[in-house]
Amino acid sequence: MCHFTRGIGSRGFCALLALAAPALAQGKTPVVIELVLALDSSASVDAREFQLQNEGIALAFRDPEVLLAVDNLKPFGAAIAIVQWGGPGETQVVLPFTHIEGARDAKAFGFRVTLVRRWMRASVTSLAAGIADSAALLEANAFEGQRKVIDVSGDGPDNSGGDLEAARNNALASGITINGLSIEAEEAGLHAYYLEHVIIGADSFAEPAQGFEDFARAIKEKLLRELRPLGS
């Protein structure tokens, strides 16, 4: 039977117990959320635009509201990784899964983001490959989360001929939610495309950015929705 514990509501405490037991049984570290930030590194994203993505993420992990959200994930915290995606077979893990247990870890993660370089400038935009590779990363890491989320950002639709529908359905079958950040730069109707063809799963959503200059605001808002406390 679950009882109220100081600092954690009864619902949250029950969720805590439900999360910890299976994770430990699998030899994995329990976390509230496993999150992959999947960044568009296709040819449509120039050097300045790519840098704005990186800077936006770094700023978000130093933002007081995001730091508070991370602290509210205690005692388990979050596991977060960053990948760059482009064409099929080109996805690159640039920051492996990192255990973010509190604000200090979040700030350190944000600093590491500033050191990340661009690994590719792919010729095509394969959302299908980015999602499939991110899902595989979620399945193979050393953490077990109450929620598993791919946070995919991009400035255009899939143009690689890959099976985007299969990729998102396979992710859903593995218990993964896909959220989107549509960067409304040159592609009209991209947000509607993300709503219909990209996001999937429980509480999935898409956050629009009005160009790359708006990415920092959009990723912060997105993280605040994703980094919600245990049991909520």
Q: Model segments located where?
A:
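Exposed acidic/Ser/Thr-rich ligand/metal-binding surfaces
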Residues: 118, 122-174, 224, 228, ...
